[in-house]
Amino acid sequence: MILVFCGTPRFAVPSLEHIVRAGHDVRLVVTQPDRPKGRGMGLAFSPVKDAALALNLPVTQPEKIKNNEEFRAQLSAIAPDAIIVVGYGRIIPQWMIDLPPLGNINVHASLLPKYRGAAPIQWAIAMGEAVTGVTTMKIDAGLDTGDMLLQAEMPIAPEDTSESLAPRLAELGAELLVETLARLEGGVIAAVPQNHAEHTLAPILKKEDGQIDFHRSAQEILNRLRGFTPWPGAFTQFRGKGFFIHQARAVAATLEPGELRIEGENLLVGAGHNTALELLEIQLEGKKRMPARDFINGYRPNSADKLGRLSS
């Protein structure tokens, strides 16, 4: 099958590698332009560009695609059977949707119609889901609203973070993509419309999503901590400074939301619905990560201290 592959992040790399390994003819890889990165702000390739070059595939990096006649002519000349889109990061214009006979095939990291949007892995964990998965779908003009082709489930382990779950879903999605293309090529797959009434959203994460609300239950806070690791993390304030929680667990204790209590070497903080957290690893603004016992010894929090948003 003649393909064009559009993708940018690390999540998309296994999909590119798998379709090449399956023998598909990837004529072009489309990825976002090189971006400044690191202290020196030197230009860095996207993970997909690195992978494409390692596979000796041609790469293009248009700044825009919607009204880009040169790019349109380039794709038209290739005449792909399908265009594969995995985390490309740009809205696919209608001309591109209409170009290939088999359509634009997307790998989305959720069990659609749940968690449509840019951060499905993070929000599935943050909302306490025990199972998630991947969906292959045909792209239409909406946001992850196209007809579904195949789905595969994956359990979310209690200790999973978005950082640990993403590589497993990327591999599962790559395998599902190869199966989807084989079935499309053989004409033995039927696209199924989504039940739009059951959709939920997974919007792009903002820094403020990491702000801890201690009126949530301990389990809700833990779910969000796991989902928002590594970014934006889970943070609050202590004595007017930023205070990041990296590891914690729910415990049986009755404290007011945000109230701190020391029990031996254990540091507890109250949460909502008569629940509490034991903080295991924390980080103060401008400092290194530390075990809670080191924080207790160094800062000696007392009954007057609380964790929470600064008052205005």
From Swiss-Prot:
GO cellular component: cytosol
InterPro entries reported in the protein's UniProt record: Fmt, Formyl_trans_C, Formyl_transf_N, Formyl_transf_N_sf, Formyl_transferase-like_C_sf, Met-tRNA-FMT_C, Met-tRNA-FMT_N
GO molecular function, one term: methionyl-tRNA formyltransferase activity
SUPFAM superfamilies named in the record: FMT C-terminal domain-like, Formyltransferase
Catalytic activity: L-methionyl-tRNA(fMet) + (6R)-10-formyltetrahydrofolate = N-formyl-L-methionyl-tRNA(fMet) + (6S)-5,6,7,8-tetrahydrofolate + H(+)
Alphabetized UniProt keyword annotations: Protein biosynthesis, Transferase
Keyword Cell division: no
EC number: 2.1.2.9
Entry binding sites for (6S)-5,6,7,8-tetrahydrofolate: S110, L111, L112, P113
Entry's transmembrane regions: none
Broadest EC class assigned to this enzyme: transferase
Pfam families cross-referenced by the UniProt entry: Formyl_trans_C, Formyl_trans_N
Top-level taxon: Bacteria
NCBIfam families: fmt (TIGR00460)
Function recorded in the entry: Attaches a formyl group to the free amino group of methionyl-tRNA(fMet). The formyl group appears to play a dual role in the initiator identity of N-formylmethionyl-tRNA by promoting its recognition by IF2 and preventing the misappropriation of this tRNA by the elongation apparatus.
Family the entry assigns: Belongs to the Fmt family.
Protein's recorded name: Methionyl-tRNA formyltransferase
